Design a protein with these regions (language model features):
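Flexible "arm" and connector segments at domain edges
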Residues: 1-119
Length: 119
C-alpha cells in the first residue's frame, strides 16, 4: 500500500473493528481463489507467508536501529489479517486459538516465575 495513503487513512479510520465483517471479507477472498486449480486458500497462504517475511524484515531493521514504526504497523496489520486467513482456511476457531494462547502464556508465566522474573 502507498505509505502516504496509509498514514493519511490512519488519521481518519475508526480504531474499532467488526470481526464478523473481517471474517466475511476474508472468506470471500479465499473462495474467490478456490477455482484456480489449487487447494482452497493456496494463494492466500502464499500471501500470508510473504507478509510474515515482510514483518520479519521490518523487525530486523528495528534491531539494526533503522526501524520505522509506520512500516512495522502496516506489516503487523497485514500479519494479523494473515492470521485470520489461516484461521479461515484451516478451520481454526477463535475459541481454539484463545485456548492455545492461554496454554502458551501459562507456560511463559511458569518459566518467568521459575526464573524469578514474575510474581
Amino acid at each position: 500500500m502507498n505509505r502516504e495513503v496509509f498514514i493519511e487513512q490512519l488519521d481518519t479510520t475508526e480504531s474499532t473493528v467488526d470481526m464478523k465483517w473481517i471474517f466475511d471479507v476474508l472468506k470471500k477472498s479465499v473462495e474467490s481463489n478456490f477455482y484456480d486449480g489449487n487447494p482452497r486458500g493456496h494463494r492466500n497462504l502464499i500471501i500470508v507467508m510473504e507478509e510474515l517475511a515482510e514483518l520479519s524484515k521490518e523487525i530486523s531493521k528495528e534491531l539494526r536501529g533503522k526501524g520505522d514504526n509506520i512500516n512495522i504497523l502496516e506489516e503487523l496489520a497485514d500479519v494479523q489479517l494473515g492470521i485470520y486467513y489461516v484461521q479461515e482456511i484451516c478451520g481454526i476457531t477463535n475459541e481454539e486459538l484463545n485456548k492455545a494462547m492461554n496454554i502458551k502464556m501459562n507456560r511463559l508465566e511458569d518459566v518467568l516465575k521459575a526464573n524469578g522474573k514474575y510474581q
